[in-house]
């Protein structure tokens, strides 16, 4: 998946953990002070769902690395446009992109 997202040359650290207490299926947290991205996944028995969630979160890592997605104190900036904290989840363009890529990234990863 990292190759498909063109992240193989990134100098950032990627840390992936499983946390049964996380509310959502996955979350990506940029730790900008230490050039690290933390991906937290909820462990589920459905490995296909877990793989798709990982692909979704790695898409967010790619968005952060490329600078198209940035976190601010009042929301997020996507390709230069600001989106406040109250922007509905499915109206956030970075989420739309991640959902559109997650299945194909996961399917390509398991073909190898």
Report each predicted region and the residues it spans:
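Post-HEXXH active-site segment of zinc metalloproteases
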Residues: 48, 64-96
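Juxtacatalytic substrate-recognition/specificity segment
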Residues: 14, 18-21, 31-39
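Zn2+-dependent metallopeptidase catalytic core
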Residues: 1-10
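Active-site recognition of the HExxH zinc-binding catalytic motif
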Residues: 52-64, 98
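Short, solvent-exposed loop/turn segments at secondary-structure junctions
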Residues: 19-23, 44-46, 68-69
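Short pre-active-site segment immediately N-terminal to the catalytic Zn-binding motif
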Residues: 37-54
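Long, well-structured alpha-helical subdomains associated
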Residues: 88-91, 97-112
């Amino acid at each position: 998946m990292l190759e498909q997202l063109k992240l193989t040359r990134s100098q950032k650290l990627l840390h992936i953990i499983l946390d049964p207490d996380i509310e959502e299926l996955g979350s990506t947290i940029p730790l900008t002070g230490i050039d690290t991205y933390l991906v937290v996944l909820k462990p589920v028995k459905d490995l296909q769902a877990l793989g798709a969630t990982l692909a979704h979160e790695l898409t967010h890592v790619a968005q952060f690395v490329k600078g198209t997605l940035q976190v601010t104190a009042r929301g997020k900036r996507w390709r230069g446009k600001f989106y406040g904290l109250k922007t509905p989840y499915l109206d956030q363009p970075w989420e739309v992109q991640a959902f559109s890529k997650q299945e194909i990234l996961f399917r390509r990863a398991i073909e190898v």
